[in-house]
């Protein structure tokens, strides 16, 4: 049997196993205790536990019969609101298994539905409200129409704090017989931006070929720019050594496969920590934003990043700042 993705293998199965979201858990526990609940809307960035919490709630409500009483749908995968309507109708027409008073429909990516489709969904929610509850999952609550929001208890899911992510990653690494270095945790957190699913996937990919996972292993797994490489590139460019800076850029692009957007994200992360004046940081941040915009419009990556290096060189000639040093591991 193929090995499970670690994200699925270590997905919490109960409220007690969820390491964050204390306020959300407290309110959902009250619903379980009462044996009843309204429709729910979970919103927040990817990887913040929305699907996990919905499945945990199903397990807590229904126990051994949670699969029979739960229907999972994805608004992006389904072929339109008519398919969703028919599947919900088929699911809701039978009584819940066990002593549950209602069945549960989990609809992921609800914010990807058009306004017309959401209006139709609202009517579906009303028609089957007697014996069915909906949990809608969305990245952006602003994309959900007000008539649906008004019919739901709304819960916000935030990116996991670094301390809790580190704790979870260490737990998984220990269980899998992997030595996880602190610099690897730092890089995983920065690259995942609080997305726990992405963080665990990065750890698994890095651990596939390394029993000791450090920042270099994570960078290789993610095809990401190491902080030391960004610092070196910045120092070469701002000191006016354009030839060496361009050589370093091409090495990272064509030998290590780093994409233009990844360069910009890495520069932005490191810029905050660089020991240079705030007005220079602001100027560089504006430059990064300009280059990032042109990349999103389809401009050539090498040309745009080379332009970035020349502009950094011009800033360096004007202000002559001291070079910055790589962060200590």
From Swiss-Prot:
Recorded GO MF terms: ATP binding; ATP hydrolysis activity; DNA binding; DNA clamp loader activity
Subunit (UniProt): Heteromultimer composed of small subunits (RfcS) and large subunits (RfcL).
UniProt xrefs under Pfam families: AAA (PF00004), RCF1-5-like_lid (PF21960), Rep_fac_C (PF08542)
UniProt keyword Nucleotide-binding, yes or no: yes
Function, in words: Part of the RFC clamp loader complex which loads the PCNA sliding clamp onto DNA.
Protein name according to UniProt: Replication factor C small subunit 1
Family assignment from sequence similarity: Belongs to the activator 1 small subunits family. RfcS subfamily.
Keywords: ATP-binding, DNA replication, Nucleotide-binding
GO biological process: DNA repair; DNA-templated DNA replication
Binding annotation for ATP: 44-51
Top-level lineage group: Archaea
Family matches, as SUPFAM superfamilies: P-loop containing nucleoside triphosphate hydrolases (SSF52540), post-AAA+ oligomerization domain-like (SSF48019)
Nucleotide-binding recorded as keyword: yes
GO cellular component term of the entry, any: DNA replication factor C complex
InterPro entries, per the entry: AAA+_ATPase (IPR003593), ATPase_AAA_core (IPR003959), DNA_pol3_clamp-load_cplx_C (IPR008921), DNA_Rep/Repair_Clamp_Loader (IPR050238), P-loop_NTPase (IPR027417), Rep_factor-C_ssu_arc (IPR023748), Rep_factorC_C (IPR013748), RFC_lid (IPR047854)
């Amino acid at each position: 049997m193929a090995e499970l993705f670690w994200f699925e293998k270590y997905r919490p199965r109960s409220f007690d196993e969820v390491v964050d979201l204390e306020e959300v858990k407290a309110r959902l526990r009250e619903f379980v205790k009462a044996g009843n609940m309204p429709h729910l809307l979970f919103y927040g960035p990817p990887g913040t536990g929305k699907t996990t919490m919905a499945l945990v709630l199903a397990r807590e409500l229904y126990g051994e019969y949670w699969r029979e009483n739960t229907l999972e749908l994805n608004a992006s995968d389904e072929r339109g609101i008519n398919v969703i309507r028919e599947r919900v109708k088929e699911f809701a027409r039978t009584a819940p298994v066990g002593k549950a008073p209602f069945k549960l429909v989990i609809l992921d990516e609800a914010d990807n539905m058009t306004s017309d489709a959401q209006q139709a969904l609202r009517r579906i929610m009303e028609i089957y409200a007697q014996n069915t509850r909906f949990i809608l999952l969305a990245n952006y609550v602003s994309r959900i129409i007000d008539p649906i929001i008004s019919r739901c208890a709304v819960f916000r899911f935030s990116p996991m704090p670094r301390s809790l992510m580190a704790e979870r990653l260490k737990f998984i690494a220990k269980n899998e017989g992997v030595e996880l270095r602190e610099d690897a945790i730092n890089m995983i957190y920065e690259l995942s931006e609080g997305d726990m699913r992405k963080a665990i996937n990065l750890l698994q990919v890095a651990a596939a070929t390394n029993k000791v996972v450090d920042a270099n292993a994570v960078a290789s797994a993610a095809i990401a720019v190491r902080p030391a490489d960004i610092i070196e590139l910045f120092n070469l460019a701002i000191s006016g050594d354009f030839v060496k800076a361009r050589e370093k850029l091409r090495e990272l692009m064509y030998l290590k496969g780093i994409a233009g957007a990844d360069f910009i994200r890495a520069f932005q992360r490191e810029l905050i920590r660089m020991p240079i004046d705030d007005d220079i940081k602001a100027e560089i941040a504006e430059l990064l934003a300009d280059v990032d915009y042109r990349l999103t419009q389809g401009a050539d990556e090498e040309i745009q990043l080379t332009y970035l290096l020349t502009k950094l060189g011009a800033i360096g000639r004007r202000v002559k700042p001291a070079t910055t040093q790589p962060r200590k591991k």
